Amino acid sequence: MIDTSIPLVDLHRHLDGNVRVNTIWELGHQHGIALPADSLETLAPFVQIQGKETSLVAFLKKLDWMVAVLADLDAVKRVAYENVADAALSGLDYAELRFSPYYMAMNHKLPIEGVVEAVVDGVKAGLKDYNVKINLIGILSRSFGQAACTQELEGLLAHKQHLVAMDLAGDEMGFPGELFNDHFKRVRDADLAITAHAGEAAGSQSMWQAIQELGATRIGHGVNAIHDPKLMEYLAKHRIGIESCPTSNLHTSTVASYAEHPFRTFMDAGVLINLNTDDPGVSAIDINHEYRIAKSELKLTDAELAQVQRNGVEMAFLSDSERKALYAAKV
């Protein structure tokens, strides 16, 4: 099912959406933070999906517990380290871990730039212990407004040498992309790549805006593109990558069922698309789960799954030499 001769990658993976349940438990007790459960076993339903949520916002409430325990920068570093470990242990050859320093900092008023430093340090420590390639993507969390995103951008750009790209995430309906055009001009000026959550809660116009105004060369989720034939044609022609996260889309009720997921529609239209976990800690999944689902529920053949794997390597924010090195390591 997974072709071991092709690098296995996960490009849409939130670091702050992958905090281990036992880590939440331990950090909560270490810092005297009131948790919603009195045992490790009963904590899981509060931080992981049971079935599916009613909306993206309901899904994000689970995420809130993952950052609620980030009481100091050591906690941030620990979570970053464990993200590298989890990526390696799930069999990934390469992962792009994205994170919102404002979101991670807000509960305990941590310094935003300090959070970025702690993430970088935690990832570096993880890479010493685990055999996996990792790059970082900074997130601007639109839900907190333009001013907060400016603070977030400043903290991230101070460490731009440790980032490959910037992302726009959060409440797509309440905070449309055009509010952040100036932010992403600065991102482009910093020579960072751009991806954006778009076409998930909002329609195809959100994707057009992300591509034409923000400068996105990849789109997170993008499920609503299928209702816009011109956009589908544009995506295919210009090799705009769709970072697809089928289980997450089910969990957030973005799609009603796997059968209704548009992954197949994208593939048939020749759109560059790959498989990703999104928030593996919240969804309680790994990349292998997504490939199993793609085969059993999305009805992809082994040949198509291999193409999806190759697509992921093509879409990755890597140089040609780095891409070749990933393939060479599989021989």
Curated annotation (Swiss-Prot):
Protein name, UniProt field: Adenosine deaminase
Gene: add
Binding residues annotated for Zn(2+), in chain numbering: 12, 14, 197, 278
GO molecular function list: 2'-deoxyadenosine deaminase activity; adenosine deaminase activity; zinc ion binding
Biological source species: Shewanella baltica (strain OS185)
Entry-linked Pfam families: A_deaminase
Species lineage: Bacteria, Pseudomonadati, Pseudomonadota, Gammaproteobacteria, Alteromonadales
Site feature Important for catalytic activity, where: 221
Tree of life domain: Bacteria
Amino acids binding substrate: 14, 16, 170, 279
Catalytic activity: adenosine + H2O + H(+) = inosine + NH4(+); 2'-deoxyadenosine + H2O + H(+) = 2'-deoxyinosine + NH4(+)
